[in-house]
């Protein structure tokens, strides 16, 4: 039954989702990824092949699922105003869960830093740890990330004002700024004088900044998808929920990075 035929009989503005295999497949893929990663890190599996396979399945499943969602929103017209409100509310709850995760990591950092154990030399950073200096790559990354927040806001306002070229330009610059940030963060990790196994400092540092790093990689993918959708005229000045949620995600990660920089790189050193 086509969308026009369904609209004649549907007396409510909500989208009744058809049966889909992607939620179940993604759940099993994420379970496989978690188990394989844990077993590999603890030495029960001698290589990363299962991790790469599970990651590939997660990626492909996500691509096919997002393809269906984009088709429902763009070509079938299933995303009404009521549906868009529900999507925005759901994404806000997702952002809240992310904030709570980072709040737990900050709690762990303060718990260890404000009362360092005698095993750590009664000092923070612990004795023998050469911390990353806040005036080096972290400061550059902060400037880059704040700049990306400005450019994506510029792109959003240009889209609302129906200036497609400026919107595309701002989004293109944002993508490259995020890629540069991720690259600089990777360089910082490869040149750091400590690892995730160097006590509580290394564990909390890499857990906090590493989780943010993974979110930035995911943000880069989301921005690339938004750029492709904008180029193919799938966004209008009044209907661009995917772009709005990506912008919100970008600003939340900017704020989290500011707290990470102040606490992990500046105050903690």
UniProtKB/Swiss-Prot annotation:
It is an enzyme of class 7 (translocase). It catalyses: 4 Fe(II)-[cytochrome c] + O2 + 8 H(+)(in) = 4 Fe(III)-[cytochrome c] + 2 H2O + 4 H(+)(out). The keyword Chloroplast does not apply. SUPFAM superfamilies: Cytochrome c oxidase subunit III-like. The keyword Protein biosynthesis does not apply. It comes from the Eukaryota. Its EC number is 7.1.1.9. It is found in: Mitochondrion inner membrane. Pfam families: COX3. InterPro entries: Cyt_c/ubiquinol_Oxase_su3, Cyt_c_oxase_su3_dom, Cyt_c_oxidase-like_su3, Cyt_c_oxidase_su3-like_sf, Cyt_c_oxidase_su3_a-hlx. GO terms for cellular component: mitochondrial inner membrane; respiratory chain complex IV. The chain crosses the membrane at residues 21-41, 45-65, 90-110, 138-160, 167-187, 205-225, 247-267. One of its GO terms (biological process) is mitochondrial electron transport, cytochrome c to oxygen. One of its GO terms (molecular function) is cytochrome-c oxidase activity. Keywords: Membrane, Mitochondrion, Mitochondrion inner membrane, Translocase, Transmembrane, Transmembrane helix. It is a multi-pass membrane protein. Component of the cytochrome c oxidase (complex IV, CIV), a multisubunit enzyme composed of a catalytic core of 3 subunits and several supernumerary subunits. The complex exists as a monomer or a dimer and forms supercomplexes (SCs) in the inner mitochondrial membrane with ubiquinol-cytochrome c oxidoreductase (cytochrome b-c1 complex, complex III, CIII). Component of the cytochrome c oxidase, the last enzyme in the mitochondrial electron transport chain which drives oxidative phosphorylation. The respiratory chain contains 3 multisubunit complexes succinate dehydrogenase (complex II, CII), ubiquinol-cytochrome c oxidoreductase (cytochrome b-c1 complex, complex III, CIII) and cytochrome c oxidase (complex IV, CIV), that cooperate to transfer electrons derived from NADH and succinate to molecular oxygen, creating an electrochemical gradient over the inner membrane that drives transmembrane transport and the ATP synthase. Belongs to the cytochrome c oxidase subunit 3 family. This is Cytochrome c oxidase subunit 3. It comes from Candida glabrata (strain ATCC 2001 / BCRC 20586 / JCM 3761 / NBRC 0622 / NRRL Y-65 / CBS 138).
